[in-house]
Amino acid sequence: MPVIEVRFKGNRREYFTPPPPAELADPLRLEDAVIVEVERGQDLGHVTALGDIALKKCARCQGGACGVGEDAAPKVEHRIVRLATEADLRTAGELRVAEEDVRRTTRDKVREHALPMKVSDTEWQWDRRKLTIYFTAEQRVDFRALVRDLAGVFRTRIELRQIGARDEAKRLDGIGRCGRQLCIASWLPEGRPVSLSLAKAQGLSLNPTQISGPCGRLLCCLHYEHDFYVQQRKRFPKEGKTLRTSEGLERVLAIDIFRERVTLRSEAGTTRVVSLDQLQA
């Protein structure tokens, strides 16, 4: 079954079946703007993957539009209706502008209700039948009264969706410490849990302020080279281990996997640096 990946605001991606070929003058292409079926109404997005690539990405998704494992056949419930027109794109652009006022109004209402939550982003569905409000909070929030209030203001179905710090960064985008676009917003499919042990294994600073991203969480990129460090460290003696060498008993103070060197300290307190080959000879 053909599957097409479509991107919406905030890097949100879902999967759809294409319309019958007879309904399209030309085949769908990447970045085509399309009108799609959603649970209640229609929305506008842009094509980001086609063919086998889209099928594999859909099969890998967990808890998303497919909700299936990688080895299972993907199940897609909605379809692409048609290509978007210039009028459709103008409508979408007007909604993006209107969302700024929606966010300000929602923040005012949150303060009125004294709720412990931060409004991150708002997203109108293209046909204005639904308004999704994304927020972060340290705990569960009872926002039922807020939803009723907002529904009265905007005269549409309101969905409040709590997201995590990394999901917020994915929606809002930004520039990382490296000076490039955030990985989570550009190419990284999903953020994996990151712990200080990853930084420790790579010999990085354990100060969270130096290894955290704009979201306030540890950098996703700590995963990228971790496997390399783990494999390389297997070639070296553990730091703190006492070895019997040609100089007698010496303790491993530090290792340098790039220069392939080991720093040793003897029982007499003298320190020397030897190559890994020399140590293993």
Region locations from a protein language model:
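A short, compositionally biased
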Residues: M1-P2, L28-L30, F236-E239, D256-E260
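Acidic-enriched and Gly/Ser
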Residues: M1-S205, Q210
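Glycine-centered tight beta-turn/hairpin loop motif at sheet-sheet or coil-to-beta transitions
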Residues: N11, T245-G248, E267-G269
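A short macromolecule-binding patch
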Residues: E14-F16, G269-Q280
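Hydrophobic/basic alpha-helical segments enriched in Actinobacteria
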Residues: E39-R40, E112, D167-A169, L222, ...
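General beta-strand recognition
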Residues: T132, R251, R261-T263
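Conserved glycine-centered short motifs in functionally critical loops
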Residues: G174-T245, E250-L253
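Basic/aromatic-rich interaction segments and small domains that mediate binding to polyanionic partners
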Residues: D256-V273
